[in-house]
Amino acid sequence: MNQIHKFFCNMTQCSQGGAGELPTVKEKTCKLSFSPFVVGASLLLGGPIAFATPLSGTQELHFSEDNYEKLLTPVDGLSPLGAGEDGMDAWYITSSNPSHASRTKLRINSDIMISAGHGGAGDNNDGNSCGGNGGDSITGSDLSIINQGMILGGSGGSGADHNGDGGEAVTGDNLFIINGEIISGGHGGDSYSDSDGGNGGDAVTGVNLPIINKGTISGGNGGNNYGEGDGGNGGDAITGSSLSVINKGTFAGGNGGAAYGYGYDGYGGNAITGDNLSVINNGAILGGNGGHWGDAINGSNMTIANSGYIISGKEDDGTQNVAGNAIHITGGNNSLILHEGSVITGDVQVNNSSILKIINNDYTGTTPTIEGDLCAGDCTTVSLSGNKFTVSGDVSFGENSSLNLAGISSLEASGNMSFGNNVKVEAIINNWAQKDYKLLSADKGITGFSVSNISIINPLLTTGAIDYTKSYISDQNKLIYGLSWNDTDGDSHGEFNLKENAELTVSTILADNLSHHNINSWDGKSLTKSGEGTLILAEKNTYSGFTNINAGILKMGTVEAMTRTAGVIVNKGATLNFSGMNQTVNTLLNSGTVLINNINAPFLPDPVIVTGNMTLEKNGHVILNNSSSNVGQTYVQKGNWHGKGGILSLGAVLGNDNSKTDRLEIAGHASGITYVAVTNEGGSGDKTLEGVQIISTDSSDKNAFIQKGRIVAGSYDYRLKQGTVSGLNTNKWYLTSQMDNQESKQMSNQESTQMSSRRASSQLVSSLNLGEGSIHTWRPEAGSYIANLIAMNTMFSPSLYDRHGSTIVDPTTGQLSETTMWIRTVGGHNEHNLADRQLKTTANRMVYQIGGDILKTNFTDHDGLHVGIMGAYGYQDSKTHNKYTSYSSRGTVSGYTAGLYSSWFQDEKERTGLYMDAWLQYSWFNNTVKGDGLTGEKYSSKGITGALEAGYIYPTIRWTAHNNIDNALYLNPQVQITRHGVKANDYIEHNGTMVTSSGGNNIQAKLGLRTSLISQSCIDKETLRKFEPFLEVNWKWSSKQYGVIMNGMSNHQIGNRNVIELKTGVGGRLADNLSIWGNVSQQLGNNSYRDTQGILGVKYTF
């Protein structure tokens, strides 16, 4: 291909220009611009080129609203017959739909060549010695052109006195061009006198031109001069403004015409010229060859993204040889983005007062960024970011210009680097290897530059802090950027002050600086970490001073990162992160935080060994449980451990003795006081025997480790103790869920005096020495869940008399008085124990209920049926206390109910004899449980409860007392069956414990006798005012015991299966339409079960 191309270039002046080989690129093959002579040459070589039958003369095409697409055909008869006349244009296109340019399409198929007329040659005999200009091939605007053939501008005619210029291939505004083959400007005509050769035509010109090119777009070649004049200039491949180019093919400027006499060769054309340009190049963009080389890209306000070839034109053999540019910035604000595969050959020229931002995203480093020079004029601004930027030639900056370096960018030249007056260099350094880093370098020297010209901006540095970096000039050809730590000129220091969220990795060895001059009061061997950012030590440093962590994070990036340090001091609020790597600290004074590894880092299978002594100050914290999924990590302190009230945090999956847990191993002696906080990471809890080991020491003081806060799993409370349950291994510390009977009694007896504060409780629990006959400690939250379950099922469970009070019947006339609306208030107090014999619960409740009859009917002349509705609000607050651990938990229930009731009396008038009562209601509640030191839990519950009651009212005797008070005595045996169906769904606590209620659908039976006395004074005989005191004795039996299952371990209320209830009260009518009633009841059961309740009710008759 390249040999054929070379043949055509020599024989026919190839439109891409350039003797010699074109670059071979992927999807970037050179396309040839054919003149009619080229077509003939192709036929001679056997090329299968065929064209459709042409039209004749200049053609005009108009796109109407209904005509959106047209196939163009060739046009003939465009070249003039007369000497020196201009060639005719091929197509004029107009459109009625400028807003639909993308829909107004011209198609040129692969068998079509659209060529304008060629200019006529001059003829002295005809009186016209000048050659004519070539015509334009397509002229129009607001179009889409899809080319799979050839579009050629007309060539200029040759002349003795003057020659013709080549025509343009496509000209117009608002053109969207998709080119798959060839678009070429016409060639200039040759000159045979002292007149210059004709100029080549441009391939594409216009404004607002989006172009997608997969073929070849090239300017026409300039005409040769065979006399004493200059060669003609090559045309541009594309020129205009607001150009948007996507190139996977080739753009080429036309070659300048050769001067074979005493003149100069013509200028090579530019590949792309214009203002407001956007270029995405994955092909080749080539300047034209000539006496003055053409630019590959020339313009202003450009954005160029390159992963292909951008190459300036090359010299011809003429007497004038002026280098062109690969990229020529003529003004405005410009960007050059370099991707992998980018090749720029030729100079990059930035005119005065222009701006160029270069982003180098090519990290292969295989070739220089520019094969040429970088020349920036006066008052220019050049910004570099990304990878280093290399230039094979010279670099120059004019007066008052600026060079900005960002990230890890640098500028390196193989030639000279020169700076004019008042040039400013600004470097913004985010992160680098901290070894001496070349910001600027030039193999042949840097001139016009000093350190005063540079401004270093360190975006990681805390505002106002002393910079840990410094820049200096080395050997007159390098600007070096490095750490102040290594400075030998008196400004050295060892402080790294990083702002919040900043992270700096030091990848060079920090050794003692023996040549420091103490200007900054630095000892030359100590490291100080300040500021809220993170400093990472990635090498095995050898400095011998102290490591002071005043703020932020000091993180290890390798093992033994500070092995020779005299000691490490972690101040309050600061963090030392070992990153899971073994370290030597000699001494570690921790008033801040020490992390075994990064938060949420993967599990560490090997222990982290820290050599040196640990002092854990009051504000200090050592964290082994850096992630909830990393339980089982081990921290080894290869030295002594002294606690001054700091905290050690571990994780554990708590169960039996074989539970998986983080561990602290101390090779030396443990002394002082260290508080231990253990987080259960999903363990179900279980009964332990000897305990779960979490800490081991070579030797240990008593109470060197004290439990902080509660340690819970499932239904169990764990505690920290020294040694095993059997009293062995007192140099080790264990978690246990059990306590022996003797000391549980001691705990219970001393609870009121020795457990007055939580700290005293923790110390006592931690110091217990267990023996045989131990018991396992239960969490008090179990009692709160049970108390809530009891309340939600029982607080809305009235009997007939609780709901209606007494039925008032006149003792003389037997007349019945009743109401249709009632309100009652209930207050109660409950105390019960749980089956574990550790937990005791007390609860207080209030209920506000309202109801009334909505229907009254009868089946016979004597009976009566009443139907009513009722609703209520209730609230309970409970507290459960463990007498052994002194931990408590509080529960609350708050909810509503709504339902129906129905009562039937055998004798509606007398209200004696048999009666039946039933009710059914739906209840819903919000519940909470909050244990000491634990996150509060919230859950809901709902369900249906109902009851059926029957009784017989028997009047035994009536009499009038000596004070004229009429009395009637009634006996009322009664029975009630209640089904409690309110329940909560299974609930998972914040600590992972699964909570399930038990004892649901409980059936409660009540059997009892009620005795009442209705009395009316003689002074009230004309009124309805009367009173009824009563006394009830009931036996209550429950089919189930309310309980809870926590991670498979169950506990339940005791004492409520068989309960005796005593109830007494009085009811009466205060006025004809107002009655009140009230009673007090006391329930007693086994195991200290008791429930006290009072009711006050009001009835109103309408």
Curated annotation (Swiss-Prot):
Q: What's a BP term from Gene Ontology annotated to this protein?
A: cell adhesion
Q: What mutagenesis or variant effect is reported for residue 44 to R?
A: Disrupts targeting to outer membrane
Outcome after substituting residue 52 to R = Disrupts targeting to outer membrane
State the residue spans of region: Autochaperone domain: 634-735
PTM comment, free text: Cleaved between Arg-758 and Arg-759 by IcsP.
Q: What triggers production of this protein?
A: Transcriptionally regulated by VirF.
Q: Where is this region: Disordered?
A: 741-763
Site described as Cleavage, positions? 758-759
Q: Where are the N-terminal repeat-type repeats located? A: 140-171, 172-205, 206-239, 240-273, 274-307
Composition bias (Polar residues) maps to 741-755
Signal peptide (residue range)? 1-52
Q: What does the UniProt function comment say about this protein?
A: An immunogenic protein essential for bacterial spreading, it elicits polar deposition of filamentous actin (actin-based motility). Inside the host (human) cell mediates nucleation and polymerization of actin molecules on the bacterial surface, which provides the propulsive force for intracellular movement and intercellular dissemination of the bacterium. During invasion of mammalian cells, triggers autophagy by binding to host ATG5. Interaction with IcsB leads to escape from the host autophagy defense system. Binds ATP and displays weak ATPase activity.
**Which NCBIfam families does this chain map to?**
autotrans_barl (TIGR01414), autotrns_rpt (TIGR02601)
Q: What is known of its domains?
A: The signal peptide, cleaved at the inner membrane, guides the autotransporter protein to the periplasmic space. Insertion of the C-terminal translocator domain (beta domain) in the outer membrane forms a hydrophilic pore for the translocation of the passenger domain (alpha domain) to the bacterial cell surface, where IcsA is cleaved by IcsP (SopA) and released into the extracellular medium. This cleavage is important for the maintenance of the sharply polarized distribution of IcsA but is not a prerequisite for intracellular spreading.
What is the protein's name according to its record? Outer membrane autotransporter IcsA
The protein's organism comes out as Shigella flexneri
